[in-house]
Swiss-Prot record:
This is Protein GrpE. It comes from Campylobacter curvus (strain 525.92). The gene is grpE. The keyword NAD does not apply. It is found in: Cytoplasm. Homodimer. Participates actively in the response to hyperosmotic and heat shock by preventing the aggregation of stress-denatured proteins, in association with DnaK and GrpE. It is the nucleotide exchange factor for DnaK and may function as a thermosensor. Unfolded proteins bind initially to DnaJ; upon interaction with the DnaJ-bound protein, DnaK hydrolyzes its bound ATP, resulting in the formation of a stable complex. GrpE releases ADP from DnaK; ATP binding to DnaK triggers the release of the substrate protein, thus completing the reaction cycle.
Length: 179
């Protein structure tokens, strides 16, 4: 019952919008009638162009929102993978000495890391550059240290790698900075 009422209201509203506005021609000359009709035509043409422009703007906004939603989903997924890549990189730093099995495991871990990095690049994700000067937009200084080898403000050591996805910081790089 409620559905029928809603549908009838929608149809009534549509019919009102489609009903032509009546133009009163009583007592008007032919030239005045033509002028009145031209005014009405111009008014309706303007309404049409405005409605069409609004529709195009809505389409563009919808497409942008759709890509933003997909990008946000990718960011969340990528953020969840960061601890995995961190753990693999810690495992890759293990020194196997002369143990052949450990060397093979390390080689497998390095291959896995490279596959992760290729996948990250494919989806617009990359490591934050940590060579050179400290940049508060992409680096997080967790330590200030004295260093003879580095000038003040230069990155001395990377504690944790940072990542950017599609131009946005996913996780800042945690670094130590020279005094």
């Amino acid at each position: 019952m409620s559905e029928e009422i809603k549908e009838q209201n929608v149809q009534d509203a549509q019919n009102e919008n489609l009903a032509p506005d009546s133009v009163n021609f009583d007592g008007l000359s032919d030239a005045a009638k033509v002028a009145e009709l031209e005014n009405k035509l111009n008014e309706l043409t303007d309404k049409y162009y405005r409605a069409n422009a609004e529709f195009e703007n809505i389409k563009k906004r919808f497409e942008k929102e759709k890509t933003d939603i997909a990008s946000y989903a990718n960011e969340k997924f990528a953020r969840d993978l960061l601890p995995v890549i961190d753990a693999l990189e810690i495992a890759a730093n293990f020194d196997p000495d002369d143990d052949e099995f450990a060397k093979n495991v390390k080689e497998g871990v390095l291959i896995t890391i490279n596959q992760f990095k290729k996948c990250f690049e494919k989806h617009g994700m990359s490591e934050i550059d940590t060579s050179g000067e400290f940049d508060p937009n992409v680096h997080n200084a967790v330590l200030r240290v004295d260093s003879e080898d580095h000038t003040s403000g230069q990155i001395v050591q990377v504690m944790q790698k940072g990542y950017i996805i599609n131009g946005r910081v996913l996780r800042p790089a945690m670094v130590s900075v020279a005094n």
